[in-house]
């Protein structure tokens, strides 16, 4: 065992010695206006059934609706800042979208993501749909599962899952209205109403959100003076209907819709490799302006609409057997225009006015059986999905400035899977084995992908298809040392789908790439106890991942049919590696009314073997999407005032992320996004004078830190690098009114 492995394993042993615990993101705190003394149980659905977070042998960060509001989590970066081992990378286009990366497992260019997102147990068919602004209203909870999830969910994931669960209709009338006013002319409103149409038989819930906010990046001209980028303009709603016609039968149908119409992301030139005097002058002018003022030659915009209808129908035959079916249909269209080089020079841009730039239709179906046979709880099921993606992209390219060409690509991805997983409680065999449980699961997956691409700039039409079949497994064993302390060990195996590159010839040896595989070993402890009279909760996980057929994108030159070459992106699977780390989440109530939550992640990753055919990868190439250190501290103090005046809480959090590589190869001299730290503050007054009214003042990025959240690197092909930056200091006022029976 290496020194680092001893260090990681030792973290779990140290926690065992402490025999106390906490869980940072997932804590809900029960309190009165004058005291906060206990940490409340948190219910999660990580194993497709409701369980106490502390009894699940998986590293999980969970958020209640109040925590999402208190920490002002409104986009992917906000969520990542509050979750260890999760980061969000934004490319700049489409402006509101971004990818989640858990434990270094994320998306590669034109390939499947290693981290999957779900809404109401249905997969997100497109990278970045869930988590964008407008996703966080009227949720029941939000969970981030870390580590391979290969045997219980519809899609196979090597990094983890992000689960969005909406509020379902209940059998009581009620709801809420919430409004927000802030700087940059921010205006936001959320609301929901719950209507029991027929008592405990027909239940309806309607929720909606809308926001308008000016952008914080301004165009100085000469083409579009005064146009603001990074603005927000979206609206959405959900309609949920729950039917319970007979005992044991439930049918939940949800329709949701969201549309957005913005001016796009305000990307900023970061580096220039061109020797063109005009481009050098444009870059120098941008450097003098700073990152909040830009000059584009392409009229940017970002328009999208998204709709989904899903149904969950279950029938409980008895306490030991339930059958459940989940079906969904999703449609999404995007139209966007984007200035790749972010300058007033005609270098490279992309635009589509007459047709969607991207779009898809997606269908998923899952049949599930849940049951219990004495001491064995099991879940078995079948899953299938179909994703059809017609994509049209008009753009000006560096090798043909001033000429608009159309890239037309159609893809079809299908998968079918069968899975089974069971948990056995050995305490049923003998009292001596009480507290000992084991979980085993297996999933067999068959995937098929096909694509047709027309790329006029290289004068060719290419098509191809590929099929894959593989199995994934899970084995966990956990033991309760005490009723409040559990230790566990797990071994999990998962795959990420392979595919092919339509931009290169079959004879190149780069047209096909196999599935990516990760085998993960994990040790953990979860404990909720008292330490010197203080309520504590600690969750620690140490993991060791063996990574095979690592998918990385690289730049290659192909014949353009005009006597020259053109650079294109391809995905290659040419390396092995390891990803090891420790995750800590803890909560502490040192005095009545004061809650301190801490989370931290340390990650160490490296390539262990690289194929001689690898492009731009060596053993020394840094892993992308993996900051070595990442953490946050949140402190909330509820003032000891009489409850008839309400509850007043002052809270603040500090978050930190070390530098992170966003380059998948060493083909660029600009691989790193710098480290950053943030401070956020909030003052809440809930139940004002005993009324169902609340108010809050908030400020995010209090120190006005300028930090990058994404990068597009065309230095090798076109001589420029651009970056996307997070919002500056934001502040505002929130008001909330709840109606219906008191809770």
List the predicted regions and their residue ranges.
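Extracytoplasmic beta-strand/coil segments of soluble accessory domains associated
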Residues: 29, 45, 77, 81-122, ...
């Amino acid at each position: 065992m290496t020194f680092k492995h001893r260090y990681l394993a030792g973290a779990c042993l140290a926690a065992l010695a402490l025999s106390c615990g906490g869980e940072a993101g997932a804590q809900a705190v029960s309190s009165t206006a004058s005291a906060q003394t206990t940490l409340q149980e948190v219910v999660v659905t990580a194993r497709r059934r409701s369980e106490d977070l502390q009894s699940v042998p998986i590293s999980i960060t969970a958020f209640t609706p109040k925590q999402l509001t208190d920490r002002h989590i409104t986009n992917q970066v906000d969520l990542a800042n509050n979750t260890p081992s999760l980061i969000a990378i934004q490319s700049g286009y489409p402006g509101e979208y971004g990818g989640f990366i858990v434990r270094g497992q994320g998306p590669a260019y034109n390939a499947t993501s290693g981290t999957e997102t779900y809404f109401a147990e249905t997969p997100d068919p497109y990278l970045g749909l869930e988590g964008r602004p407008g996703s966080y209203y009227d949720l029941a909870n939000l969970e981030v599962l870390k580590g391979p999830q290969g045997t219980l969910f519809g899609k196979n994931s090597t990094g983890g899952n992000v689960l969005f669960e909406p509020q379902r209709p209940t059998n009581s009338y009620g709801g809420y209205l919430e409004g927000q006013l802030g700087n940059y002319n921010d205006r936001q409103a959320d609301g929901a109403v719950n209507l029991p149409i027929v008592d405990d038989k027909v239940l309806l819930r309607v929720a909606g959100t809308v926001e308008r906010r000016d952008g914080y990046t301004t165009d100085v001209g000469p083409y579009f003076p005064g146009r603001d980028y990074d603005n927000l303009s979206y609206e959405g709603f959900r309609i949920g209907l729950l039917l319970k016609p007979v005992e044991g039968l439930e049918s939940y149908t949800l329709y949701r819709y969201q549309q957005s119409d913005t001016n796009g992301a305000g990307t900023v030139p970061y580096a220039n490799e061109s020797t063109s005097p005009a481009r050098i002058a444009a870059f120098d002018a941008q450097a003098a302006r700073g990152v909040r003022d830009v000059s584009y030659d392409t009229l940017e915009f970002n328009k999208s609409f998204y709709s989904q209808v899903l149904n969950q129908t279950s029938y409980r035959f008895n306490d030991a057997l339930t059958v459940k079916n989940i079906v969904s249909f999703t449609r999404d269209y995007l139209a966007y225009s984007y200035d790749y080089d972010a300058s007033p020079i005609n270098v490279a841009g992309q635009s589509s006015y007459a047709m969607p730039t991207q779009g898809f239709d997606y269908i998923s179906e899952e049949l599930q059986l849940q049951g219990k046979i004495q001491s064995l709880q099991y879940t078995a099921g079948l899953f299938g999905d179909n994703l059809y993606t017609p994509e049209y992209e008009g753009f000006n390219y560096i090798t043909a400035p001033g000429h608009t060409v159309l890239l037309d690509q159609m893809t079809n991805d299908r998968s079918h899977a069968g899975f089974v997983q069971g948990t056995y409680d050995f305490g049923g065999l003998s009292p001596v084995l009480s507290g000992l449980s084991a979980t085993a699961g297996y999933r067999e997956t068959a995937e098929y992908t096909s694509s047709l691409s027309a790329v006029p700039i290289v004068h060719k039409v290419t098509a191809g298809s590929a099929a894959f079949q593989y199995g994934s497994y899970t084995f966990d064993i956990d033991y309760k040392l005490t009723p409040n302390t559990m230790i566990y060990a797990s071994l999990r195996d998962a795959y990420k789908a392979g595919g092919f590159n339509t931009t290169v010839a079959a004879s190149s040896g780069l047209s096909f790439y196999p599935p990516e595989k990760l085998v993960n070993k994990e040790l953990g402890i979860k404990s909720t106890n008292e330490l010197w009279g203080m309520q504590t909760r600690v969750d620690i996980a140490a993991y060791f991942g063996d990574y095979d057929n690592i998918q990385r994108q690289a730049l290659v030159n192909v014949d353009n049919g005009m006597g020259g070459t053109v650079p294109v992106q391809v995905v290659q699977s040419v390396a092995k590696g390891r990803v090891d780390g420790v995750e800590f989440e803890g909560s502490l109530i040192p005095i009545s009314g004061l809650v301190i939550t801490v989370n931290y992640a340390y990650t160490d990753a490296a390539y262990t073997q690289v194929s001689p055919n690898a492009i731009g990868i060596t053993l020394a190439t840094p892993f992308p999407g993996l900051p070595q250190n990442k953490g946050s501290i949140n402190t909330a103090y509820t003032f000891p005032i009489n409850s008839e005046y309400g509850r007043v809480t002052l809270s603040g959090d500090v978050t930190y992320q070390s530098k992170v590589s966003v380059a998948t190869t060493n083909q660029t001299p600009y691989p790193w996004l710098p480290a950053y730290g943030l401070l956020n503050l909030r003052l809440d007054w809930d139940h004002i004078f005993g009324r169902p009214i609340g108010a809050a003042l908030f400020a995010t990025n209090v120190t006005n830190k300028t930090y990058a959240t994404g990068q597009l690197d065309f230095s090798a092909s076109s001589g420029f690098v651009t970056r996307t930056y997070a919002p500056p200091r934001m502040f505002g006022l929130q008001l909330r009114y709840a109606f219906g029976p008191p809770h």
